[in-house]
């Protein structure tokens, strides 16, 4: 607000909040937009009052800022904030308990409320569960429809109609209650004239016929049907009293009363006799039932005694068996304990006897048998020498057997066989050698590689050097002719190679650098003559094309002989090292 100081003119204070509230109310009720409040313009340069001629008094402005009123204390807000803070602290404590063992021990020891369920929720809840819950809540919130402006207007109109109806009903009930509460004196003169005329009743004494009444000794034992009959007769008498001739029927009423009393006495006597008969029959039936009950009780008692005796006998039997088992087990335990005690005594006696004997022997050893220790040491050394000498003899014998077996196997495989001799299998030689060399790994490995090479061979199947040389000499012409074949030779090529191979001049001597077929054949023959089978096999294996294919069988046989020779030489060398 603005206030002018130093002048007699005061500006009106305009409350914007109140004007806004009034304008909003006008808009809601009349649906018309109210104009803004008038604005008062104040000129700051010109004073509102004409100043005196001596000194002009300046106008100072002071802006007063109104302080906002302090909020009142809200109990609901305090409780809500406290609950929210406590829930956050409690949830944080339980979450820290899942990560820290000390906090978990504190929670478990103090038995915080619902800590097990909340810990289970915290440990088992994942990020996916929270996302699913958020999506579900979001979907439910999206399904909620907020009321539109038309719905709000309809609701307000309904509330207005209901309020009017409620006021009408309240006024109606209030007027009815006031009309009922009025007394006759409070009525108006017109209402008093409209009231009906009241007539006063006049009573007089009239003689009536006597009613039927039962005597006191019969009244308590009369049946209800008789009482109903008497009541109906009394009603009939009262109806007669209403007629003008009631006095002439008094004798009739008395006679009816006498007959009803007699009837009541007879009924009472019949009832008494019936009750006595019923009592007698009840006593008789009670006696019969008591006798039957007694008989049944005796039967049940006898049956229970029989069952009791049977159960008792069975329990006694089981108890006796159990006692026998326990006695037997105790007897066995006692006998075993006694046996163990006797055994311990014997062991102790044996130990003491051995100790005594050892002491006596030590005394004798220190006395008469002083040199017995030296003799024992010499005997021990002699035993060691005998054992080592025996091992040496065994190894020497094994070595001799292995060398003999290897020599026999080598002679059978590599020696030149006689023409008239029959071929023999190599398997017995291998079995003998395998039985002898069971403790040497090198011999076992060599025999393991040698067995598949010669298991299917005989003494005549391994070719000698001379046989290999003769076979190669027979193979040489084919090698010469195949060396002259073109890459894709036909019949004419084979015939021409066969003819031209006859024209080739054989090479004498060894040419180390020669790569032609004649030089290779010459080197192979020279190596075979000198006994260098490995060099000859290497030269033949280096051949290419048709010449290599023709020489393949010869190379296989030569390699087999080389492998057998190598393995036999290895076995022989290893046997010498044993």
Swiss-Prot record:
One of its GO terms (cellular component) is MICOS complex. It comes from the Eukaryota. Residues 30-74 are mitochondrial matrix. It is found in: Mitochondrion inner membrane. Keywords: Coiled coil, Membrane, Mitochondrion, Mitochondrion inner membrane, Transit peptide, Transmembrane, Transmembrane helix. It is a single-pass membrane protein. Residues 174-193 are annotated as: Disordered. Residues 1-29 form a transit peptide. Residues 98-578 are mitochondrial intermembrane. GO terms for biological process: cristae formation. The chain crosses the membrane at residues 75-97. Residues 294-392 form a coiled coil. The keyword Transit peptide applies. Pfam families: Mitofilin (PF09731). Residues 174-185 have a biased composition (Basic and acidic residues). Component of the mitochondrial contact site and cristae organizing system (MICOS) complex. Belongs to the MICOS complex subunit Mic60 family. Component of the MICOS complex, a large protein complex of the mitochondrial inner membrane that plays crucial roles in the maintenance of crista junctions, inner membrane architecture, and formation of contact sites to the outer membrane. Plays a role in keeping cristae membranes connected to the inner boundary membrane. Also promotes protein import via the mitochondrial intermembrane space assembly (MIA) pathway. This is MICOS complex subunit MIC60. It comes from Lodderomyces elongisporus (strain ATCC 11503 / CBS 2605 / JCM 1781 / NBRC 1676 / NRRL YB-4239) (Yeast). The gene is MIC60.
């Amino acid at each position: 607000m603005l206030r002018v100081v130093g002048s007699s003119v005061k500006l009106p204070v305009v409350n914007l909040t109140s004007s806004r509230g009034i304008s909003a109310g006008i808009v809601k009720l009349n649906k018309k937009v109210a104009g803004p409040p008038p604005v008062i313009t104040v000129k700051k340069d010109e004073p509102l009052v004409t100043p005196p001629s001596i000194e002009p008094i300046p106008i100072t402005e002071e802006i007063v800022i109104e302080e906002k009123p302090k909020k009142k204390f809200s109990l609901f807000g305090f409780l809500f904030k406290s609950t929210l803070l406590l829930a956050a602290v409690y949830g944080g404590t339980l979450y820290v308990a899942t990560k820290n063992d000390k906090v978990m021990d504190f929670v478990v020891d103090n038995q915080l409320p619902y800590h097990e369920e909340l810990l289970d929720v915290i440990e088992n809840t994942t990020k996916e569960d929270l996302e699913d819950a958020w999506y579900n809540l979001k979907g439910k919130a999206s399904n909620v429809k907020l009321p539109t402006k038309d719905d709000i207007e309809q609701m307000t109109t309904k509330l207005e109609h209901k309020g009017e109806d409620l006021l009408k009903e309240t006024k109606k009930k209030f007027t009815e209650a006031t009309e009922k509460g009025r007394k006759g004196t409070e009525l108006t003169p017109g209402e008093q004239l409209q009231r009906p005329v009241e007539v006063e009743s006049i009573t007089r004494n009239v003689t009536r016929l006597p009613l039927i009444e039962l005597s006191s000794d019969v009244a308590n034992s009369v049946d209800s049907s008789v009482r109903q009959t008497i009541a109906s007769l009394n009603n009939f008498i009262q109806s007669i009293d209403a007629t003008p001739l009631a006095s002439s029927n008094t004798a009739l009423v008395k006679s009816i009363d006498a007959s009803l009393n007699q009837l009541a006495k007879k009924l009472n006597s019949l009832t008494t006799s019936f009750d006595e008969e019923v009592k007698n029959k009840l006593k008789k039936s009670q006696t019969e039932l008591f006798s039957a009950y007694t008989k049944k009780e005796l039967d049940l008692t006898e049956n229970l005694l029989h069952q009791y005796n049977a159960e008792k006998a069975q329990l006694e039997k089981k108890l006796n068996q159990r006692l026998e088992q326990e006695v037997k087990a105790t007897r066995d335990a006692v006998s075993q304990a006694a046996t163990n005690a006797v055994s311990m005594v014997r062991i102790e006696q044996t130990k003491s006897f051995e100790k005594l004997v050892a002491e006596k022997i030590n005394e004798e050893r220190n006395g008469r048998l002083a040199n017995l220790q030296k003799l024992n040491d010499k005997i021990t050394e002699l035993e060691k020498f005998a054992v080592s000498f025996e091992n040496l003899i065994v190894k020497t014998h094994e070595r001799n057997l292995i060398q003999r077996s290897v020599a026999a196997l080598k002679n059978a495989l590599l020696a030149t066989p006689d023409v008239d001799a029959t071929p023999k299998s190599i398997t017995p030689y291998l079995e003998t050698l395998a039985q002898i060399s069971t403790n040497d790994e090198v011999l076992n490995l060599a025999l393991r590689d040698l067995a598949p090479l010669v298991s299917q061979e005989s003494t005549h199947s391994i070719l000698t050097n001379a046989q290999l040389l003769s076979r190669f000499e027979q193979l040489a012409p084919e090698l010469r002719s195949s060396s002259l074949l073109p890459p894709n030779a036909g019949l004419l090529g084979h015939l021409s190679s066969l003819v031209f191979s006859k024209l080739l001049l054989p090479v004498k001597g060894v040419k180390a650098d020669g790569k032609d077929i004649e030089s290779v054949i010459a080197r192979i023959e020279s190596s075979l003559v000198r006994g260098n089978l490995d060099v000859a096999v290497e030269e033949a294996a280096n051949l290419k094309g048709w010449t290599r294919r023709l020489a393949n069988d010869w190379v296989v046989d030569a390699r087999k002989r080389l492998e057998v020779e190598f393995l036999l030489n290895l076995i022989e060398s290893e046997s010498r090292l044993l």
